[in-house]
Amino acid sequence: MAAEASSTGLASCHLVESKSGAQGASGCQCTRCGRKVSVASGDHHKFPCGHAFCELCLLAPQEYTTSKCTDCEVHTTVSMNQGHYPVDGFIEEDSSLEALPPKMVNNCSSDLEKTVDQLINDLEHSSSIHRNVSNPSAVMSETEEIDEALKIAGCNFEQLSNAIKMLDSTQDQTRQETHSLTEAVEKQFDTLLASLDSRKKSLCEELIRRTDDYLSKLVTVKSYIEEKKSDLDAAMKIAKELRSAPSLRTYCDLTQIIRTLKLTFESELSQVSSIIPRNTPRLDINCSEAICMFSSMGKIEFEDSTKCYPQENEDGQNVQKKFNNRKELCCDVYSSLEKKKVDAAVLTDETPEPPLQAEAPDRHLEGKKKQPTKEMVVVTSPKTIAVLPQLGSSPDVIIEEIIEENLESCFTDDPIETSGYPKKPPQKEQSAPVGSKAGCPELVFVSHVIHPCHFYVRKYSQIKDATILEKKMKQVCNRSLHLDPSDILELGARIFVNSIKNRMWCRGIITEIIPSKTKNIRKPCSPTKFSVCEISLIQIFMVDFGNSEVLIITGVGDTHEGPEHDGEQHITLSDFCLLLMKSEPYSEELLKDIPHLAHLCSLKDIVPYNSTEGWEKEAKVEFLKMVNKKAVLMKVFGEEDDVLIVDLQKPPTNKISSDMPVSLRDALVFMELARFRSQSPRSHSEKNTTLCYHPPILPEEMTEVSVMVCHINSPTDFYLQLMENLDFLSLLKTIEEFYKGEDGENLEILCPLQNQACVAKFEDGIWYRAKVIGLPGHREVEVKYVDFGNTAKITLKDMRKIKDEFLEPPEKAIKCKLAYVEPSKKSQWSKKAKEKFEEKTQDKFVTCSVIKILENNVLLVELFDSRAPGKSAVSINDQLVKEGLASYEAGYTLKDNSKKHLEVWDPSPEEIITSEINNLSPLSVKSLPNENFQSLYNKELPVNICNVISPEKIYVQWLLTENLLNSLEEKMVAAYEHSEWKPVKWECDMHCAVKVPAKNQWRRGQILRMVTDKLVEVLLYDVGVELVVNIHCLRELQENLKTMGRLSLECSLVDIRPTGGSDKWTATACDCLSLHLTGAIATIILQESNTTWPLPVKIFCRDEKGERVDVSKYLIKKGLALRERRVSKSSNSHSPEKSLEIPLEQGDSVVTKCFKINFDTNKKIADKVNEHKVPDSKGKKSESRSTGCYRPPAVPNTSSFEAIVTCIGDDGTIFVVPKLSEFELIKMMDEIQSNLKCLGLLEPYSWKKGEPCAVRGSDTLWYRGKVMEVVGGTIRVQYLDHGFTEKIPQCHLYPILLYPDTPQFCIPCQLYQTLPVGNTWQPDAIELLQELLSKREVDIHIMELPNNSWGKLSVHLYFDGMSLSHFMAHHKYCIFEHTEEIFKEKPRGQNKKYEDENWKIRFEDLLLPEMEAPVLPPYLSSLLPPPEELFAVQVKHIVSPDEMYICLDSEDSYTQFNHHGDTDDSGVSWESESENLEEALQRFNKNVETFPPLTDFSSEMPCLAEYADGLWYRAKIISIKEFNPLSVLVLFVDYGCTEKLTINRLRQIPVQLMQYPAQAIKVLLAGFKPPLSDSGKTRIPYCPKWSMEALWTMIDCLQGKQLYASSVAQAPEQIVTLYEDEQYPVHMSLVEMGLADKDE
């Protein structure tokens, strides 16, 4: 605009110049000297400002050569050569509109006109009158006045231009807003009309429902009255007969008849009188009020458009109306005219700035007048989006248009301000599918409901997509042409429909077409394509709403919808073309980015309340009542077959008065409209299946145990825990880690039961084991924490189902009561008594003396304070009595302590420990390892385990050192809390005070090593912790703090060693030991009288069952350690420390220790340490090292032996087990199974290649194995005794060595002097070997022993006398290295058994009479009804999705189409019997053992075969599968299934059973075929063209449904089409899921 102002000023100057030039063409007057100069002479110079000077005035003064006008001081570039002075640049400062006074805006037009008229008059007057200007100053003042006027004119001109532009913009925007508002009004009132129509239908349905209920009651009462009337009529007839014939009275009870006649029917008549009065139904509606409300409904508000008015419409949804591009024109925008001085500097060689955009003046003006107008936009995150429906309470209807424009910015809960001018348009964001993350809640709208397990929702976040879709659909349908009667419609095709229910154009899919010629029933296998003019009914599914609409043409026969269309919207119209449009390619391209908005859902784990009757109508009504027209929170649990498994919940910030329950699923169950899948209706069997804990393990009576009191209600009602449990803390930690993760979300308990075991969250937010002890209601549950004894009331959200592994450990909390005492007031325990008892026992270790075990496992105990000062424990029971807080029970005799015992007892371990601690020497010398512990040798010493690093480094503290440790800590804090760091030269083994940064504690320590100049590694020897700290955390240890000895001892477990052949303990063993022992109370026993550092000890604790266990044996049992025989110290007397250390390197040889463990229960466990010297080979790694401690296979000491082939390796290696070793292998496997039943839960373990292990196979049996390769989360292992190699998960391995003294049973073999083609056995050759040799008995001839005991044995192998090498060479799989002859058959003379076997077969037995089998005809085949006839069938057996066995469901149909005469084609005559096949089979099953065995195994031979259920059924022989042992494949002709049976399960069939035709009919299904592209990886092995997913889906489609079939062809194969409920082809489910293609 500044440029426009400048141009305006220049134009005004040019105008003046031209006018003056026209009037004064003869000459001009010099402004400086007044001399007149002729214009034609050219001796004058005129400046752009209008002033003229003669050439003399410009040249004379030196300062005027700078091109400066002397009057107005405007600089101008002067060219003396050309004789004139052009303007290269002329810049005026931009005059802003705010510089003008307010009145000038209104009067600018008139002032401008006056100024222009006055200027023209002055110029005309000057042209006619030539006056001499004698005063140059006057001329200059006039010139200045003109310049100032031009400036003002330029500003006014700019203001007028801006005003016009603003008015044009406002005019356009107002029209757009009006148009948009008009559309919104129409849309809202259409919604109101639809709501009124829906309410009308609802009222009509309610009236009909109530009338039907009333009429049904009338019918019931009427039938009851009629029955009474008929009874009375019969009695009256009898009485009349007796009256006319007195002789008959003796044959009946006359008294009873008279009593019956006199009976009154008051109760029956009262029912009539009570049910007949009925209030006449009437319609209660206030139309006048509704009309009045409609007349004032809605209003158009003209408010500040930059504000947001959150309101609430009738549906309870928050809407906002935002006008983004609106601008206002204010009359008082400009307040004053700011006068600015024009910059007179001359710009050289610069172009003027381009004009600003149209929006720039508006922003500039708004900034000058006031702060920019801003609109408040409340932006919410998905978590708080449910707040929106609660804002506002105005009853007015607000015209709305919901358009979310910037979804990416809507992720903050704080309101933000945005300026009024437009922003950059947002980019489109692809919406994520519903339920992409299981458990992630999302707001949705329910769009259509069929029943609670079949409904559709639309995402709240897809409102923008819905709005865009509606606009695009309107655009597409406005441009597209309607259907033509000749257009072809096809089932499954996309189509656009003008939905009556949804009141808009919608996308749809054609799901049903009924042509007008078929009388409303489309026949099976009929065409799926029809022209529009041939269709009488069409059903369309709305993919964006979930509902279906049925369109019916009027006047075409008696067209009416079938029962399958009852729940759909029906529209009757004269022409489909009015509501339908075909989907064209350009429209598909336009809509392809918008996914289907309706998502199919089902409520999780609920079924109809009455499964036999299905979902009641009331369930759908209540469902709609709770979710209709409101946003609800949907929680997704998973997805099954494209159906989201969900629960609809109330948004957390929704109104309390809302109809939406907290959980829709629970609400339907509560209203008895549904039940959970695991429930049985009205069944009380839940109590029998309630999960319960094992009762706590109680100590024996009259024993003393160490316990901790965990919860106290009173001194006669408290709970305690037995101490020294290894796994209890681990159990608590495992429970917390599992349930605090996401896995616990799917274990919610919806209907808790009394005494049900569960896991519950406590006040500290941690999960503990609990059980339900009360159900107070209001979705609250009272639970008891079974490991602590306390109770609490919690909500269902703080409960979870308990896993089996957490259910097995018994309860830890034992209920107790103090013995001998009772409340002092004999009523209740006083508050002071409870507090004192808690003070003495709560969360403390005490000694418990069990007096008696009462009922319900309550212990009667006496507690002793084991921490009391002195040498003897004090009874807490007696203390309560002494302090007056309790009294002894009546009859209790006080203990007599007056007698002093004269016996002298050995000092207790506690006294010895106290004495040792007091006698410890100062720490100035490293004295503790050299202390004399002879007095403690082989005694049980209670300790607290403070830190575990490995089994050979465990730090313990004496129990009595706790007070010393606390006292020492107080001294350390007092000495070093406020101390300052001083530089000290630290060295190894120096003592120091260490500040532990993590705990802010001061501890004594000793420097182990200098890590860097700033970091040192120290040992906190009072607690046994090693850590690296900065030297700024160290202080010099004061001398008075060195007098007290170390408070922790370093110990090492004896008699165990690491697994895996290594000298280092695995991380798994260390972590497991640390997890179970750290912080536990245990007992140690010193194993050596002489001091060895660390102290060799045995550690004992109590496990979950309360049994005392040796920690060393515990590690061995877990497979984390191996037993080691203790070495006598006499042989290593020269080494007082590390006495068990054995050098591993001696000279040039490496010593390998091989530890052997035998689990043989019949032998005493022998622990040996063997040392084998193996030459140090740098070039080749020894293979014996990779096998761990197992021995190589033992090759029989013969040239040939019989064996069984167990496995064929991938490289062609043949693994065999000698027949002589087979029994030993079976025996060892049995022992392994019995010994490995009690393996515990395996902790994380780091596997290494070659490590021995125990493998749990797929048959759940344990095998010896070794690790071949570690690949990610799986491990490739080899079964040592069978040769198999496979990849299995780590959870199926256990690090344990099984029977190391037993050699490997299977021997790897290779064919002697046989080369496979290509030097490696090809895959087809491997397959042939596997098929030929697996589990086969063979003869092995040893030709060459391997160089290494683990190598392959070179052999000749013979199977059934045939040489395997010759066999493989004959089939071109291998060649021979040499031309030496290889026997084609096994030499006869080498094995007598081979010759004997050839003479075992005797033909005489086959001629015996009992071996004769009757000649029987084949089974009669069942026939199907003729084509195009629908008949009921049952599916007996499924071979593949398109091949199965069926039988006729109706017995009449079966008899009609399968009636055979008494004599068949073979001449065999059947006796007609009345019994059917089932009855005949039941009769023959009773004496089946009398039937002769089957001797004729020819194909198609009829027989009786034993099924898996132990019953015998009709069958026929298919083929012989195996000869050793003989097994036959048979087909059960009445069921269609096949099975491989041994001959002892086959019998000759009685002739009487041959008269019945085979029930199972083999058919092929028509209408579909395998898909061309199937992503399913798992195929059916015997039918690879079909996937397993397709097979399972077909089974689901057929199971439990009434099926019908229609025959398509009966020769050469029987082909049928299978239907569900006579209409829907079953294969359509596979086609819709993409598991099959249609076969036209």
Swiss-Prot record:
Keywords (A to Z) from UniProt: Acetylation, Cytoplasm, Developmental protein, Differentiation, Metal-binding, Nucleus, Phosphoprotein, Repeat, Spermatogenesis, Zinc, Zinc-finger
Keyword DNA damage: no
SMART domains: TUDOR
Residues covered by the Tudor domain: 751-809, 985-1044, 1246-1303, 1496-1556
Zn finger (RING-type) location: 30-73
GO molecular function, one term: zinc ion binding
Listed Gene3D superfamilies: 2.30.30.140, 2.40.50.90
Span list, region Disordered: 348-376, 413-435, 1170-1191
Biased composition annotated in UniProt, kind: Basic and acidic residues: 360-373, 1170-1184
Knockout mutant characteristics: Male mice are sterile, exhibit a complete arrest in round spermatids and fail to produce sperm.
PROSITE patterns for the chain: TUDOR, ZF_RING_1, ZF_RING_2
Residue numbers of Phosphoserine PTMs: 134
Pfam families xrefs: TUDOR (PF00567)
Listed name of the protein: RING finger protein 17
Species, as recorded: Mus musculus (Mouse)
Classification lineage: Eukaryota, Metazoa, Chordata, Craniata, Vertebrata
